[in-house]
C-alpha cells in the first residue's frame, strides 16, 4: 500500500511541477516585455499553484484566524520546507529564503521565479537586507520570514531573532505572528520536520509514502510595531507563538 501511495502521489506531484515550470517560464517571458510589471500576475499564479501543491501533500490542513487585509510582516515558527507552500496558499506572500535554496534542482528556480528574496546568512549586511525587505512592505506586499533562523522538530520554539524585524519598523507595518503545528495520531509528527542532514528528495519520499498527517495553522493577533524596538517586537511575536503552540 505504501508503494502504491508513493507512486500515485509522486505522479500527481510531478504533474504539478511540470505545470509550475510552464507557468514560471510564461511569467519570465512576460517579464521581458518593455515596461511590464508582472508582480500581480506572479503573485496570483504563485498562490494558485501553491494551493494545488498543498492539496497534493499528505496533510489535512486546518486554519484558525483570518489573514490580514493590510500588508504585514508575517513571522512563523519553522518546521519544514512545507511551511512555505502551506502559508503561501493563504495569502499573496513574498518569501525570504537562505541563498542555498536557489541551488536546489527545479525547486530553487521555481522559488526564484515566484519572487523569493534570497539572503546569504552571515553576510553581515543586515542594513541592506532590511532595506530590501522594507521596500517590499512599502509596496503593499506581505512578507514572510522565519525568525528562528532554522527548522526545528516542532516540539520547541527557538529564540526569534530581531534582526529582520527592523523592516516592519522601517515600513511602519504590523507583525502577523503565525503558529504552525504538525500532528500525526495525536502526537507531534516525526515525519514532517525537515531538520539535520535531511535532503529534499528523501524527505519528500518519506512524506509521500506515509499516512496523512494534520497541520494546524494559527493566524494570531497582529502586533503593532509603533513604539517598539526590534528586540521587543521579536519577543512579543515569540511569546504569541509559544502560547499558541504549547
Model segments located where?
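Residue-level preference for the first positions of well-ordered beta-strands
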Residues: 71-73, 140-146, 216
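Catalytic core of membrane glycerolipid acyltransferases/transacylases, capturing the structured
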Residues: 20, 24-34, 38-40, 55-56, ...
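N-terminal membrane-anchoring alpha-helices
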Residues: 1-60
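Catalytic-site beta-strand/loop segments enriched in glycine and acidic/polar residues
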Residues: 136-165
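Generic beta-sheet signal
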Residues: 98, 119, 146, 178-180
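A cross-family acyltransferase "interaction/gating" segment
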Residues: 106-109, 122, 155-232, 236
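A membrane-cytosol interface segment of integral membrane proteins
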Residues: 116-137, 142
Amino acid at each position: 500500500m505504501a508503494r502504491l501511495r508513493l507512486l500515485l502521489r509522486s505522479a500527481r506531484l510531478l504533474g504539478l511541477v511540470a505545470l509550475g515550470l510552464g507557468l514560471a517560464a510564461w511569467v519570465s517571458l512576460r517579464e521581458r516585455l518593455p515596461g511590464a510589471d508582472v508582480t500581480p500576475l506572479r503573485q496570483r499564479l504563485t498562490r494558485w499553484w501553491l494551493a494545488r501543491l498543498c492539496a497534493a501533500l499528505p496533510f489535512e490542513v486546518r486554519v484558525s484566524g483570518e489573514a490580514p487585509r493590510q500588508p504585514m510582516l508575517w513571522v512563523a515558527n519553522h518546521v519544514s520546507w512545507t511551511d512555505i507552500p502551506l502559508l503561501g496558499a493563504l495569502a499573496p506572500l513574498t518569501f525570504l529564503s537562505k541563498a542555498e535554496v536557489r541551488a536546489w534542482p527545479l525547486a530553487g528556480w521555481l522559488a526564484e521565479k515566484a519572487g523569493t528574496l534570497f539572503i546569504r546568512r552571515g553576510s553581515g549586511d543586515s542594513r541592506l537586507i532590511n532595506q530590501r525587505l522594507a521596500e517590499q512592505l512599502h509596496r503593499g506586499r506581505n512578507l514572510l520570514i522565519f525568525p528562528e533562523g532554522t527548522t526545528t522538530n516542532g516540539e520547541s520554539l527557538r529564540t526569534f531573532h530581531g534582526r529582520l524585524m527592523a523592516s516592519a519598523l522601517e515600513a511602519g507595518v504590523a507583525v502577523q505572528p503565525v503558529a504552525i503545528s504538525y500532528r500525526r495520531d495525536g502526537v507531534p509528527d516525526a515525519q514532517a520536520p525537515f531538520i539535520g542532514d535531511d535532503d529534499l528528495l528523501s524527505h519528500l519520499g518519506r512524506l509521500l509514502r506515509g499516512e496523512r498527517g494534520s497541520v494546524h495553522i494559527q493566524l494570531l493577533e497582529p502586533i503593532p510595531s509603533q513604539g517598539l524596538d526590534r528586540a521587543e517586537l521579536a519577543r512579543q511575536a515569540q511569546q504569541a507563538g509559544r502560547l499558541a503552540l504549547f
